[in-house]
Amino acid sequence: MNILGFFQRLGRALQLPIAVLPVAALLLRFGQPDLLNVPFIAQAGGAIFDNLALIFAIGVASSWSKDNAGSAALAGAVGYFVMTKAMVTINPEINMGVLAGIITGLVAGAVYNRWAGIKLPDFLSFFGGKRFVPIATGFFCLILAAIFGYVWPPVQHAIHSGGEWIVSAGALGSGIFGFINRLLIPTGLHQVLNTIAWFQIGEFTNAAGTVFHGDINRFYAGDGTAGMFMSGFFPIMMFGLPGAALAMYLAAPKARRPMVGGMLLSVAITAFLTGVTEPLEFLFLFLAPLLYLLHAVLTGISLFIATALGIHAGFSFSAGAIDYVLMYSLPAASKNVWMLLVMGVVFFFVYFLLFSAVIRMFNLKTPGREDKAADVVTEEANSNTEEGLTQLATSYIAAVGGTDNLKAIDACITRLRLTVGDSAKVNDAACKRLGASGVVKLNKQTIQVIVGAKAESIGDEMKKVVTRGPVAAAAAAPAGNVATAAPAAKPQAVANAKTVESLVSPITGDVVALEQVPDEAFASKAVGDGIAVKPTDNIVVAPAAGTVVKIFNTNHAFCLETNNGAEIVVHMGIDTVALEGKGFKRLVEEGTDVKAGEPILEMDLDFLNANARSMISPVVCSNSDDYSALVILASGKVVAGQTPLYEIKGK
């Protein structure tokens, strides 16, 4: 993993423990005397902030492990206790704060990924597998304790000095932080910067003698000097960016305003209420980078002004109206937090006027002002149904180069974080037609697709679709529905079309209509048009002459590119990838040229019928959109290598 990919993944891992803070803040706030006056509720919220480093250790360990494992989370806690308790025996002054939790969480996650399946000798077998993970993590963290016991004190001094410099720099320091914070948003590295500012810099000791580090911790612990890294975000997120949204709406041609109005309104309301601004920011970041640079400068100015005015405000989640109301009467909030609203109104007009002028002056392609080809949004991109989500996930896989190019899938609140074989194969236009705000290509293997609040659900569905079978790359510039191939045309409708490919059945068995396949991706023809067969024999053959371009590692599916350019996917059974190759044996290797009827796979059909979810096997043309029609020829029983299955008609 390259360094940029590491920090991108770390940013995602930090999302889980950070997600706990809004709940803690609500409990802490509502338990205060001026609201519910229920101390045990306030203490419940305070407990989260008091043990934040431990929560980071558990959350990061779970997120970093390859399957969000509970044993990794336990190992994170074990590692944290071992390292922190051992370090202070070397130097009692050591305090790593949440960094200790992050480091031990990373160690625990890495140990799980490497040794969760370890086999030990019989007399130690009880400690093998996942039980080995907390033990090994504790050992490694003990070594880290010995190292950090001597290495960390100068680092701690440097952090303390750096924090003091930024704090002593006052308004200038907070302004620099705000500017850099926005510039790092496209890479996702802002989460790392935020963690240092919000959970590490600064120190406050309460009446009970408990020490708190970081702007957020100190603010909710009652430190009246906290908030310099938070206050200035409120005018930007609640007012400035909605002003930018209005400017982009009015800059769009009147005929296109209805198309972009709903989208801009929804992201503006989200920014105002919750402070989640990335969906709005990414609308103009990629289309008009100059505007984003202007936005970063204005954010720095806002933090500068807020600090210069002595405003101390804080948030548990982000600088939206909800957090503003919750923190307004907190002990740490300054008496002049109302000035943030005045600043907000000013920034609303500043953003509106500057964005309006710059968009028109440089003819920037903000939403609604793009070329006509960019206006097309596929139907499934607006679907909230389960089927629509599956189609959308399949389409994104195709847009990033298909399963051949997609190597790893992660997601955070607003973006898909993907590792690909070659970012040059990613179809930016196809992603935008699906509703993505933009695509960030961090390097040749690391990309981010900005999809908004549904990122995690889309990412999870993408993982499911990938396990079901291969998805071909999207065409270079498709002109309509990217994911769903047109239904097969009736024979009489294509009577004059030339047959470019004739396929024989690759399997002996019974024909099943594609719509009856117990898998939405195939049944909806998102993967391609074709037919399915329920096998009654063990041998799978090539349905046409061509090249076997891909055989999955588990040998349950293969892709054949015919001599005439048709891309045929033969997928044996549904969810058979979960069998990890059991029941399948490949008879040829990738890159082999084959003739129609030549054996490709051998199956243990008895085993598969007993263990697979279904052995109904789709045979689809993944690039069926390149042809005018697909004419089904087979029905009833078919014989592998002999019975004609379907014909593909040219345009």
UniProtKB/Swiss-Prot annotation:
GO biological process: N-acetylglucosamine transport; phosphoenolpyruvate-dependent sugar phosphotransferase system
Cofactor entry: Zn(2+)
Site (Important for phospho-donor activity): H556
Catalytic activity: N(pros)-phospho-L-histidyl-[protein] + N-acetyl-D-glucosamine(out) = N-acetyl-D-glucosamine 6-phosphate(in) + L-histidyl-[protein]
Keywords: Cell inner membrane, Cell membrane, Kinase, Membrane, Metal-binding, Phosphoprotein, Phosphotransferase system, Sugar transport, Transferase, Transmembrane, Transmembrane helix, Transport, Zinc
Subcellular location: Cell inner membrane
Phosphocysteine found at: C412
InterPro entries attached to this UniProt entry: Dup_hybrid_motif (IPR011055), Glu_permease_IIB (IPR036878), PTrfase_EIIB_Cys (IPR018113), PTS_EIIA_1_perm (IPR001127), PTS_EIIC (IPR003352), PTS_EIIC_1 (IPR013013), PTS_Glucose_EIICBA (IPR050429), PTS_IIB_1 (IPR001996)
Residues where Zn(2+) binds: H556, H571
Entry protein name: PTS system N-acetylglucosamine-specific EIICBA component
Species name: Klebsiella pneumoniae
Lineage: Bacteria, Pseudomonadati, Pseudomonadota, Gammaproteobacteria, Enterobacterales
